[in-house]
């Protein structure tokens, strides 16, 4: 089988797209409406991915008929615990557009991620409608809650993930196993960045920040400047030795006041999300933080993409036929 192809919708800063690329998928297109996020995508993969700066509602899926994978992080406000949870009644709900594209593209597999709020009982009827539509299009479907910390990301970040695969490949799909051992800590992940400016408190800070981070919250354009979330989240950051009331322009230097908690920079937040340091984030600080904070961690996308790729690369042999062949070889 040749290389696997994909289309990414609601691509944002490219976290999911990057992880899927690392899993072996070549993106035929990355669709994103936000200008700053498109700047990020072009800065990093402008010569390799077709960047479509447009509303996903305007994208004709027939142009990408039968790519291997349709993936995306559809907007979460309709289902977010922090929001009003309007679900299908929210005009920001892009699941209908995603399902339209599934019908037009007819990919072999689908990967859509959202906040864990979508997995609550309140939205059970909505989930059933989505699954019924996908099954009507010939897909086997799975929902699961995936924790970023189980895939090498120093952050809790539970996400509700939908995977749909057509036969005969569906029988081969297995959810990725958590990585062995504990997740890296915030201190271990960021120590070199905190120390790079000569801050003498970096080593002690790293020891204090000896656990994973709470879920990073990117927020929306309706809110003001960037910060690390609501009161409860900021309290969790404070226990890690981080001032969550804003995002820093620069790393702490040698004259950083003793007893004062440092703030994270956008680059630090990107690293906590699993982005490589080489990944350029376009836009001013608030826009850059919003992109990073709302991203799907690349390592999680890589794990999911690897699992999907493994199923798709089994060819046209069904699991049942493979079992028959295996038992015949032992006879």
In which residue ranges do the predicted regions lie?
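A short, Lys/Arg-enriched amphipathic alpha-helix followed by its capping loop at the start of a domain
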Residues: 19-26, 44
